[in-house]
Amino acid sequence: MIQSITSQGLVLYNRNFREDDKLVKIFTEQVGKCMFFVKHAGQSKLAPVIQPLVLARFLLRINDDGLSYIEDYHEVMTFPKINSDLFVMAYATYVAALADASLQDNQQDAPLFAFLQKTLELMEAGLDYQVLTNIFEIQILTRFGISLNFNECVFCHRVGQAFDFSFKYGACLCPEHYHEDERRCHLNPNIPYLLNQFQAIDFETLETISLKPGIKQELRQFMDQLYEEYVGIHLKSKKFIDSLADWGQLLKEEKK
């Protein structure tokens, strides 16, 4: 079956196919993720809009049984600030890859599309890209079938405590129940508190967000633990972010 649709879409990636052709993965609002064939991509009028992290309204020909094609486009958004900063671009690429990993091809998920688009728009607007990534990570866990409660103790259900997290129980422990897991995470209590807040944040109303570097580092470390334990994916874009910690500071110093 072949259908023509017009849909908002975000280019996730492209890869070479044959000598001068490309396969382009686009996350569309209407039909989810699809792979598109672009012939003679280097000379094609589509060349400017098949780069990663380009958002546009595409006219698409969807073929359920063969190659799909991009017929036209308009209303292009290229996120110039993201693309001009290696660090922001690395995190933007990672959240796009997470969305890709969380969704089957040809599966519509308009709320996820809107969430990813808004995340990129807030990064482009200059909000803290590391914190936005943490929020995206914690909220998208449900797409991987993971639901975590950072609001109450798993034993007594009290709220507003200095919680720690237990992988043994997959939940939080209050101080009176720390003893239930000798291998609890020994987190800064601010980490479960922030993650509980992050789960409820609506990006449509978010105007500013700021955290101290030490807290952001602790969040990053714990999010890595959560993803390793519960999701188990190892994305190239995440490995690149990890490498930034080793040599990224040198680049920042050279810019001064």
Curated annotation (Swiss-Prot):
Keywords attached to this Swiss-Prot or TrEMBL record, sorted alphabetically, are: DNA damage, DNA recombination, DNA repair
Q: Tell me yes or no: is DNA damage among this UniProt entry's keywords.
A: yes
Under the heading Gene3D superfamilies, the entry gives: Nucleic acid-binding proteins (2.40.50.140), Recombination protein O, C-terminal domain (1.20.1440.120)
Q: Tell me the GO BP annotations in alphabetical order.
A: DNA recombination; double-strand break repair
A GO CC term assigned to this protein in UniProt: bacterial nucleoid
Q: Which InterPro entries match?
A: ARFGAP/RecO, DNA_rep/recomb_RecO_N, NA-bd_OB-fold, RecO, RecO_C
Q: Is Glycosyltransferase among this UniProt entry's keywords?
A: no
What PANTHER family does the entry give? DNA REPAIR PROTEIN RECO
User: What role does it play?
Assistant: Involved in DNA repair and RecF pathway recombination.
Similarity field: Belongs to the RecO family.
Which HAMAP family does this UniProt record tie to the protein? RecO
This one is known as DNA repair protein RecO
Task: Name the species this protein comes from.
Answer: Streptococcus pneumoniae serotype 19F (strain G54)
Question: What does UniProt list as this organism's lineage?
Answer: Bacteria, Bacillati, Bacillota, Bacilli, Lactobacillales
